[in-house]
Amino acid sequence: MLVGIDVGSKGSCNLMAACGTINSTFSLYTSATTKNGDGDRKFNAMQEVTLKVVEGYATRNKAPPKEMIIFLNASPGDQINLYQENYCRKLQENIKKAYNNHEVQLTVVMVNLRNSERFFTAENNPRNVAPGTLVSSTIVSKNYDFFIISQQSNKGSIVPNHYKVIMSESKLEEGHLQELIFSQCFNYVNWLGSIKIPAILMYARKCARFSAEVMNGMDVSSGLQSRLYYV
């Protein structure tokens, strides 16, 4: 199961949304929103929307997912240890409580979209590197992190995404996870080609913003939760 989590706001309406896949081909989805906040309220909101999309998966498949890969829209200053303690580990505990001690293999990836790094081709007339370029050595930390450029641009310089894997229980090797991330940038229904971020995270962003800006925080009917009504 793939899950994306992002936030959206308009005025005093500040929402968090999650979107999750509910089939093996990553083509069917469920979504959920809740009020967002700061500190503990933010992590509680993350738990709430994640558990809601897990419930959507379990309803369709008669069982919760065995493995989850979760993408979080993060900021450069976000502290990894807070997310590990207040989100990752608590999520596993909550899933165990809700589903009869069910253990889920969890991989959580923080996605930083705002970076100062830029990458160019090594030639006399430097250009943006091609989509699919991976940078996983030299300028990255000793932790599990890497840069991926997934989109094409002919104007200006491309801002790469910085992916930080803060929990990894998946059987996926590092290279396979990177391939999955890049392939998911082609899975967005409203664009021909690749987008900047994995589609599941873009759907979460669209859901949060639509719910805040158009729905003003109102809940949608249960029948719409399995539809991409916000795209």
Where are these regions (language model features)?
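Long, contiguous domain-sized segments
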Residues: 1-231
